[in-house]
Amino acid sequence: MNRREFLSLGTCAAAGVCLADAVPVVTPEELANADFDAALKVIWETTLHDVEKRKAALGVLQKHIYAMKTGRPFIQALDRGLTIPSDELAALHAKHPVIRWADEAFDKVVRELKETVVTGDVPAVWYLYNMGVVVKTKTCAFAIDICHRKAAELAPLLDFALCTHAHGDHYTDAFVAAMRKAGRPFVSNFVLIWNWYCNEAVKDLEIKGVRIHVTQTDHNQYLPKSMLCYEVFCPGAKPFVIYHTGDTNRACQIEGKLLTREPDLFFAHCAIGFSFPEACRNTVRAKLTVPLHHQELGHLGGRWRCVGFHEEPARILRELGDMGLKAAMPVWGDRII
């Protein structure tokens, strides 16, 4: 068992979550790679707004995620990164098509990042995995919480990266090393890089014309002030504002910390206790709210990995819809804007 697996076990145990037993049982008869391929084709041919068109396909993909049971194959692939031989990778993709989906999603985001030209004030925004988003403005490209086995390939395309906290489902060592090798800023509260280390209650940065208001919150009662929240003002006559709260676990934690009450995009954890209705009533009324951290495979079980499309995220979308707010739930590789 490596360090990442050990920490994943500890996190689940601390939360009182049974590991493999927390995952719904899926029988081999329910799984077929042909069905998975057909479902994934639907995803690539639709957008996050095509909820009904995607519904059946998402159910198929979720079964394959549950079938991985502990998530260990994903964790091992994440740790090995780009060193997996091609023949071994092909076998891994065949046995666990969910990992192939994650890789195809990464390739899609990289391809579209290269091809997309942004001319106005509204950036292009993609969802990669877990809490990871990639943003391209008219002047630069950046990312938040990038965790993927191929993440190092993304570094040369970015002008900087932000990380909310030091948990292995929000960054990889290979990505940090690639950012440093490329001479790109990596902002965090755990990597000691001159100018880009943040451990203050409030800090303001500017990189490539992007203004970043950084504040602290708690991950949980055992990890106080361990989270960096980023309120990002993309350059433009009317700055496009992205607010990313990482694994902040209580809505009251963000009260009084935003410079604007109405960001354009609001990202928060869907299954850690964070109340989206409370946050939207009291603090942030975004033009689009996006719950993330569903289908997280890096933990060895427990609700974080097993949150499916028909559970917490779906409930959050209903609650926000009842409040007259717009919300969306992307899957890996989706372009959000």
Feature names for model-found ranges:
Residues 146-194, 260-267:
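Active-site metal-binding motif and surrounding structural segment of the metallo-beta-lactamase
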Residues 150-151, 167-171, 193-195, 221-222, ...:
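Active-site environment of divalent metal-dependent phosphoester hydrolases
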Residues 173-179, 254-258, 275-284:
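A short acidic, amphipathic alpha-helical/loop segment
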Residues 26-156, 195-261, 274, 331-337:
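Core dinuclear metal-dependent hydrolase active-site scaffold
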